[in-house]
Amino acid sequence: MKLNQISRIVMAAALLGSVTAVTAQEATKESDREYYGRPSFWRPKDKTGINVFETTKEHDTIPFQGLRLRLGAGFTQQYQNLDHRTKSSVPLYKMGPGFNLAMANLITDVQLADGIRLDLTTYLSTRHHNEAWVKGGYIQFDKLPFNTPFFNKLMEYATIKIGHMEINYGDQHFRRSDAGQGIYNPFGENLIADAFSTEIGGEIYLQKKGVFGMVGVTNGTINSSIGKQARDGSGDSTKYPAVYFKAGIDKNVGKARVRFTGSAYINNKSQRNVLYAGDRAGSWYWGALEPAAAQGFTTGRFTPNFSRNVQAVMLNGFVKYGGLEFFGTYETAKGNAGNAGDATKGIIADLDKRTMNQTAVEGLYRLGARENVYVAARYNTVNSELPGYTEKVNINRTSLAAGWFLTNNVLLKGEYVIQKYNDFKPTDIRYGGKFNGYVIEAVVGF
């Protein structure tokens, strides 16, 4: 066996050893007790938060006896061995096997009052921002302090969220890796077109017996929005908020759990909409199909460059029967972007809307009474129009993954991935592009 092959195995074993340092006795002490200091109506940050979507209105088991503060965290350390190639003449970044920068989140949960909680997440270290950076925060109301029969009855079914927060568009964002918080994601990376954004606004939910609806309104951009809006090609400089809707059903049918949801997001004009470019952490495929002369943070992902006039719809289906799980995503979106030259004159000239479609299908099987081991497969494809192209481009990805929960808080997972790029222009580094290989990731969440 060659020396470099031995060194790779040793380094991968070191990652495994750093996780398996937990004793066998500790690994079997899976406690179902309540978390000390946890808030009400929340999503746990460990394994028990998997397949939790919107919080429910079920009666809480911890009575409010005063302010409660809980500090949590998410931590990921990844080893990757990827190979990439292109038919373009653009030189590729020369990469080999090695460890990626660890990512970490600090999560602050505060129960402020009965039925009122605060969620604040800080990125301590990510691929894009290796310094501390606030992701966002919100206040969630599941009860109101008015103590009147009308509001008490209303809040049996209603939830209100207000803040600079991750918007609830689609179900896929509940299963994605978010910097150090990778315990919900059975795979090594998010979807190719990663719909995720933090915006300033509010959401109102109504739910009863597994049927729910939601409406949200935000400023339509990831940053503050006090700047004057640029005029478009028609001379209109009006600034619009983003409005989004979601409805679905989540019920147990016999021994199976079945969930179907539909979401729509509309943002006619904002300064800088980032529905498909709002992740400030970065992708998990470091250096993949990246040019030698540049260092990005979204390698392996695709954005259609919609910054204005965005209209998007996502449909999701989830079925769980015993250890078998199915999760599907269909998404279609259209929008346009500003022309850089005209933008300097205060005019946005690009009024030609482009369309993008995305499909993802994944299946998992979780083994054992506690479902501590799983195997998974996912196929993800994107077809999109781009400026200057007469035909749509295509990107497709096949992922095979497996994972092992040593405890509810510690996960070791690995993924083998093949991603191909089709119909890009010869001048584009993605022309005839492909990357493949494996990633191994240790995750801690609490």
Describe every region a protein language model picked out.
Residues 60-83, 94-223, 237-255, 259, ...:
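Outer membrane beta-barrel
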Residues 49, 73-75, 105, 282, ...:
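Glycine-centered small-residue hotspots that permit tight backbone geometry or close packing
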Residues 2-76, 149:
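N-terminal periplasmic/intermembrane-space "pro-region" immediately following the signal or transit peptide
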Residues 26-35, 41-46, 93, 138-141, ...:
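Outer-membrane beta-barrel pore domains
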Residues 78-87, 123-127, 146-148, 167-169, ...:
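Sequence/structural signature of outer-membrane beta-barrel proteins
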Residues 175-187, 223-232, 280-289:
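Short, flexible helix-coil linker/hinge segments at the edges of structured domains or between repeats
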Residues 192, 234-235, 429-430:
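Alpha-helix capping and helix-loop boundary segments enriched in small/acidic/polar residues
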